Amino acid sequence: MSEDTYKTIAVPSEGIYTEKRSKFIAIALPVRTVEEVKAHLETYQKKYYDARHVCYAYMLGHERKDFRANDNGEPSGTAGKPILGQINSNELTDILIIVVRYFGGIKLGTSGLIVAYKAAAAEAIAAATVIEKTVDETVTFLFEYRFMNDVMRVVKEEEPEIQEQSYDM
């Protein structure tokens, strides 16, 4: 993977992990903004209103600098961090992974929770279609007509996606 590409998922996916009767449902979603993350969290918190915990982690941007992990009441570092760890291990971005926990009556302990949240997130990623995208930028060129041949030569060599052309005489 080069600097001008990044990995993400194409469509939502799901994974399920069960440990000592506790059920962990992981949902991986492609996202582009924090607003999308918040909207998905609201939707899934309502959908799984009866779950004990709805934990998550996300990573945004091709530079992978915008991220967050949330334990949602689980002991600190036992849910969000392992989920984020799976995102990092797979070098993914523009992704939100939500893991919903239904408590099965048997406590898992700190290490058990870490393993379970990590495994659930890994299941959702394994079920996902991972794609490589290019980092796109919009560039506008304004030039005099006499430079047309030079500009078109560069366009032919570099093969950019041309979104619009206009000629003002």
What do these predicted ranges mean?
Residues 27, 54-56, 94-98, 138:
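Structural motif
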Residues 1-77:
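C-terminal regulatory domains involved in ligand/effector binding and gene-expression control
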Residues 37-40, 117, 150-154:
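Hydrophobic side chains in well-ordered alpha-helices
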Residues 142-161:
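Short amphipathic alpha-helix segments
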Residues 164-169:
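Non-DNA-binding regulatory cores of transcription-related proteins
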